[in-house]
Amino acid sequence: MIDEVRELGIYTAYNANVDAIVNLNAEIIQRLIEEFGPDKIKRRLEEYPREINEPLDFVARLVHALKTGKPMAVPLVNEELHQWFDKTFKYDTERIGGQAGIIANILVGLKVKKVIAYTPFLPKRLAELFKEGILYPVVEEDKLVLKPIQSAYREGDPLKVNRIFEFRKGTRFKLGDEVIEVPHSGRFIVSSRFESISRIETKDELRKFLPEIGEMVDGAILSGYQGIRLQYSDGKDANYYLRRAKEDIRLLKKNKDIKIHVEFASIQDRRLRKKVVNNIFPMVDSVGMDEAEIAYILSVLGYSDLADRIFMYNRIEDAILGGMIILDELNFEILQVHTIYYLMYITHRDNPLSEEELMRSLDFGTILAATRASLGDINDPRDVKVGMSVPYNERSEYIKLRFEEAKRKLRLKEYKVVIVPTRLVPNPVSTVGLGDTISTGTFLSYLSLLRRHQ
């Protein structure tokens, strides 16, 4: 499978950012408390800021996360705080974040034949985190040119940095007279949410070359629609950017009917979620999501009872039923679902791949994820041997049993539904981007297996 996958060309867009990681210790935490004062922090904690406008908002929410030991994410809405964070903290590591960024680096790690990555903003700090071998499309003298992404950066482009503060169980610090011990390990994420970086689009000068890019590749993986806003200060809105997103898809397919996969991510705003789902899904061939995202989508399609059942009981039969509804209502080719214990495909009976081939495709996805979890990254196609040696998770027999029961209960005559247990690494080096890794592996293997039927 790996050799066939490497023969493919893939285009990926739109979202990439810098993940800057700080490993917190008692000294760093105490320094922050002394700088702002325990009384001010306690008062701000009582107000419980839901976004970060100034440093005190950050310190108060960080202390709350440390006291509870719960992972949390709070949006940073003041762009001027970039400088304060960069002066205050020494980052232990910086790595690529955002689905399109992570996926591009996975593709080039597998030595896929051609990897073209596009993000509307490419500042130098971001460009340097992409791996060697990734191409970025630019327009020079009214011609399309593919440049190494590291040299294609633009001075002055806005930067999206998500700052991840890792904390460890047992860390002790003082907040005034109160001694606090962190009860659980976790992370506190400060996610950048500025208007300047929320315009998910292909720039006008490049857009007319999308049919040419489509001819160069076998498939495209698109993501980042969750970054769109309902309204913008210049009068534009979500509808404007979704119209442009649909035009991008049409243009990519104009000269060559390439397969397009959308990697969905949770969208908290119900109105925006409905707009993205109804506008984008019917335009593409493949969609990837987890079971919670199935429930979120069902709720905006009018199936709130089934959505509630998925949230409450997490049963395979409900996930299958929900997946079939999404596939039919939004009329695309194949749905890929990734959960901690299993991966699933739902497609129509006339799909050219057999159920055995679909299972092989899913298995390739879980092999890639196990490889990344074991090694922290994928830098060579031979790395996948590590993932192949990871056994299926301990619930795999139970999952197969539940799946057989679900098949007896549901009417599946018009569908092909297959499930493969995941390969779980007991002590993963990294868990970041595992869903993106699964979707990359399943989509690549799906494309390569379809080629056999052409």
Swiss-Prot record:
Activity regulation field: Inhibited by AMP and ATP.
Transmembrane spans: none
Cofactor: binding details: Binds 1 Mg(2+) ion per subunit.
Residues that coordinate or bind Mg(2+): 263, 293, 436
Pathway: Carbohydrate degradation; glycolysis
Residues annotated as signal peptide: none
Database matches in PROSITE patterns: ADPK (PS51255)
Origin: domain of life: Archaea
Compartments, record wording: Cytoplasm
EC number annotated for this UniProt entry: 2.7.1.146
GO BP annotations listed: fructose metabolic process; glycolytic process
Domain ADPK: 1-452
InterPro entries named in the record: ADP_PFK/GK, ADP_PFK/GK_arc, ADP_PFK_arc, Ribokinase-like
Assembly information from the UniProt record: Homotetramer.
PANTHER family: ADP-DEPENDENT GLUCOKINASE (PTHR21208:SF1)
Protein name listed in UniProt: ADP-specific phosphofructokinase
